[in-house]
Amino acid sequence: MISVAEAPPGRQVQLRLLAGSNDGRLDSHLAQHGRLPVLETNQVMGMARDAGLTGRGGAGFPLWRKLSAVAAGGRAPVVIANGAEGEPASGKDRALLTYAPNLVLDGLQLVALGAQSVVLYAPAAGHRALRELLDARRAAGLDRVPVRLVTAPDAFVAGEESAAAAAVAGRGAVPADKLVRITESGPGGAPTLVQNVETLAHLAMIARYGAGWFRAAGTAEEPGTFLATVSGAVASPGVVEAGYGVALGDLIAAAGGASAPLSAVLVGGYHGGWVPAEGALPVSRAGLMPYGGSPGAGVIVALPRNACGLMETARIAGYLAGQVAGQCGPCVNGLPRLASTLTDLAQLRARPGLPAEVDRLARLVTGRGACRHPDGTARLIHSAMRAFEADVAAHLTGRCLATDARG
Amino acid sequence: MNRLHVDWTACDGRGLCAELLPELLVEDDWGYPAPRGDMSVPPALEPAARQAVDRCPALALRLTAPASS
Ligand SMILES: Cc1cc2nc3c(=O)[nH]c(=O)nc-3n(C[C@H](O)[C@H](O)[C@H](O)COP(=O)(O)O)c2cc1C
Ligand code: SF4
Ligand code: SF4
């Protein structure tokens, strides 16, 4: 099992969000960045658009479009900062909420004007410190709009946007049907804005330093930095920050370098894709497109050559199958079947037609759930079947290349 | 073209819609409706699609205009 070790900031490729003292204190934050300028919603929207800021929670959707969809509703919205981070291989949102929470809370204020309810949705473990910080900010007159803390349960799908909106409305944190978008009408009928905490932290930086400054990092098409959680076969796993387009090898070097020869790297997390362990590969949508991948929420897992990629994927698929919110038939039935079929292949219980069956099941579940959990799971498995093609062939003859590599 | 939308959180998977609309839907391994194509409804099948929507016991099946869904 790959787990994320405590994720101290400090190693970097290009530090911005995590460039300060990272003590989480209000006084150090104000000393470093000063007060947030007062901006109207239109100005915030314009800056987000000029900066090209996209969501850091996985889908990479432009922030300004969501802001404008919610504003078009003409009713006071519910605004949610999403710090759930249900993904086990991700530690960046927790790191951000621990080391630079004031940037997140600044960003939340920028999108909270006129809202009927403003929420920070985060795991319970961080609430005490966040509560104290929110009180201090109110006392210092920083937060025009009061912020409510709501507990994000420890479940993979709890951070999906409609699940977050449901939890905030006092219901179970499970996803809802998408016929009506929550930016139009969320659980209580109000337009609902859900943004990843890192997206909001970038917005707080843009409000201070400008769209041009933001664009000085990353690529022209994918501007800015992102937080990456690097784990697996690296010397010192943790959270690093880099501009989009950073070389995969530089991210791994920033996490202490590979601790063993690598065979592949999982990029984008449990809903992401396997890519070759090529140091020069740019970590950006454009760079990862040929592999059907994307940076997603910045999860990078390095796979050592003596571990079997099919086994590792089967393990993740088993985990994901256990995380289905028991609602949608194709997902509830399909993901466990998909995981067990892949496990048969991984554990050398080969039957003819097994790879084709994995492929069929992955296609069958895609697009057939209230949320994109089945789609993401299918994407991961499709990418594994491509990236570990040689392993699949070996497994069908009863051999495992990773076991062979161990000698 | 209008499209079929299934609310998967409501669908009970007994496959009534696939019986009523075999041109567009098949039952998957577990009885849930799976699209033969991409869920868009050609005009000629619109009446049958409406009937399937009306008869869905779970109110899970909808016809949506192209812009949404
Ligand atoms: C199964 C699933 C789990 C998700 N979990 C999270 C999460 O833990 N945190 C998060 O910010 N976004 C998560 N997302 C993405 C959210 O639905 C949503 O796109 C995001 O919070 C929007 O914020 P952003 O545009 O700032 O990225 C998840 C999506 C899916 C399908
Ligand atoms: S698609 Fe799966 S994970 Fe998503 S809501 Fe439906 S059952 Fe839950
Ligand atoms: S008729 Fe309705 S409940 Fe039955 S399978 Fe079709 S969509 Fe699901």
Per-segment meaning from a language model:
Chain A
Residues M1-M45:
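Cofactor-/ligand-binding subdomain signature composed of acidic, glycine-rich
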Residues H29, I80-D93, E184, T229-V234:
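Gly-rich Lys/Arg/Thr-decorated short loops/hinges at beta-loop-alpha junctions or inter-strand turns
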Residues G34, L39-G46, A51-T54, E87-P88, ...:
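Small-residue-enriched alpha-helical segments and adjacent helix-cap loops
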Residues G34-M45, G74-P77, D93-L96, A122, ...:
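Ferredoxin-type iron-sulfur electron-transfer modules in oxidoreductases and energy-metabolism complexes
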Residues R49-V70, A155-A166, A321-N333, G369-I381:
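Conserved phosphate/anionic-ligand binding catalytic regions in large, soluble enzymes, centered on
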Residues P77-I80, A84, L97, P101-A112:
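Glycine- and Gly-Pro-enriched alpha-helical subdomains that act as flexible
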Residues L105-V111, G243-S259:
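Short amphipathic, charge-patterned alpha-helical segments
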Residues G126-Y244, A255-S259:
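Hydrophobic alpha-helical positions that pack around
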